[in-house]
Regions:
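A short, well-structured juxtamembrane/interface segment
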Residues: 74-89
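Conserved Rossmann-like nucleotide-cofactor binding loop
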Residues: 15
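Metal-dependent phosphoesterase core characteristic of DEDDh/y 3'-5' exonuclease domains
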Residues: 2-9, 20-67, 87-203
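A general structural signal for well-ordered secondary-structure junctions
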Residues: 78, 95, 146, 222-223
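Generic alpha-helical secondary structure signal
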Residues: 55, 59, 79-80, 118, ...
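Acidic two-metal-ion nuclease catalytic site recognized across multiple nuclease folds
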Residues: 1, 168-251
């Protein structure tokens, strides 16, 4: 019997931005599986567990997820809970998260058995570029995914509700593109549909002049640089005109 095709969505709540200064205080998960009908759907109940981060939770992050030090004082340690959640049996074909680079900092290859990651933020840029925004919750209310239980996806910024919401985005992405395609998009910087700042803010990249585009080619943000390079290549005869764009090649 072939192994089941399952992707596990992960969401973390932490004490701050990155290890080793900061640590996990909650992990949530929700599986999405390929059915016998060839369609992807949420499967299982998912879940979450609090984690003792081994350090105080700063007020600035308490204000986001509302997890207090006393909530995690008797919780298990990260090294005791991470591996069974991140590398369960049967093995998942990939892990997924919204802005997966954040989760991947804490969910190291040693804990995930080297699993590939799908970043639903990067994939949303490709599949739904017309969205007014690309946060997990913006996509939730702009797309209104079929079958989502509103209350089950609340409160926002807690690990299971966020994983549950992300799983609906992932389900719909997998019904539009392959696992391999989503992983490929996730391994390169985000392809932004609109300019983020400056006098052209909110405009499509094809609308800005050559001088403005040239300035973005050396931007500090890798997503902006990548997108500017993509648009520059299009204007030089690549992209939608002439050679295939990187996005078309991936498709």
């Amino acid at each position: 019997m072939p192994a089941p095709q399952i992707v596990r969505v992960i969401d973390l709540e932490t004490t701050g931005a990155a290890p080793p200064t900061h640590a996990v205080c909650e992990i949530g998960w929700q599986d999405v599986a390929l059915g016998s009908d060839g369609r992807w759907a949420l499967t299982g109940e998912g879940g979450s567990t609090l984690v003792n981060p081994g350090r105080p939770i700063p007020p600035v992050t308490m204000a986001v997820h509302h997890i207090l030090d006393e909530h995690v004082a008797d919780a298990p340690w990260w090294h005791d809970v991470a591996r069974p959640i991140l590398d369960p049996w049967p093995r998942r074909v990939a892990l997924a998260a919204h802005r997966a680079s954040f989760e991947a900092q804490f969910c190291t290859p040693a804990l995930t058995h080297g699993a590939d990651w799908i970043c639903t933020w990067k994939c949303a840029l490709r599949l739904w570029p017309e969205s007014p925004g690309f946060s997990n919750q913006m996509l939730r209310y702009w797309r209104r995914p079929e079958g989502m239980e509103h209350e089950r996806g609340l409160p926002a910024h807690r690990a299971f509700p966020d994983a549950y919401v992300t799983a609906f985005h992932l389900r719909d992405m997998l019904n539009l593109a392959s696992v391999e395609q989503l992983i490929a998009w996730s391994k390169v910087p985000g392809l932004l549909p609109r300019v983020r700042y400056g006098p052209y803010r909110g405009r499509e990249w094809s609308e800005i002049d050559d001088d403005a585009l040239a300035a973005f080619l050396t931007d500090r943000d890798e997503d902006i640089r990548f997108t500017a390079e993509h648009e520059y290549a299009r204007r030089q005869g690549g992209g939608a005109i002439g050679r295939e764009s990187r996005q078309q090649q991936l498709l």
